[in-house]
Amino acid sequence: MTASYLPSIFVPLVGLVFPAITMASLSIYIEQDEIV
């Protein structure tokens, strides 16, 4: 088993997960700011 396929999966995963977490945290912060 070679790990040569890991970067091709890990890079897009980080590129999708990191912005998703950022957008989610921003939306939660904005919603809490509007409620308070």
Curated annotation (Swiss-Prot):
Pfam family, one: PSI_8
Gene Ontology terms: biological process: photosynthesis
Compartments in which it is found: Plastid, Chloroplast thylakoid membrane
Statement: the UniProt record of this protein carries the keyword Cell wall biogenesis/degradation: no
CC per GO annotation: chloroplast thylakoid membrane; photosystem I
UniProt membrane topology term: Single-pass membrane protein
Transmembrane segments: 10-30
Keywords, comma-separated and alphabetical: Chloroplast, Membrane, Photosynthesis, Photosystem I, Plastid, Thylakoid, Transmembrane, Transmembrane helix
Signal peptide as annotated in the record: none
The protein's role, per its UniProt record: May help in the organization of the PsaL subunit.
NCBIfam families: PRK11877.1, PS_I_psaI
HAMAP family according to UniProt: PSI_PsaI (MF_00431)
Family, as annotated: Belongs to the PsaI family.
Descriptive protein name: Photosystem I reaction center subunit VIII
Species: Angiopteris lygodiifolia (Turnip fern)
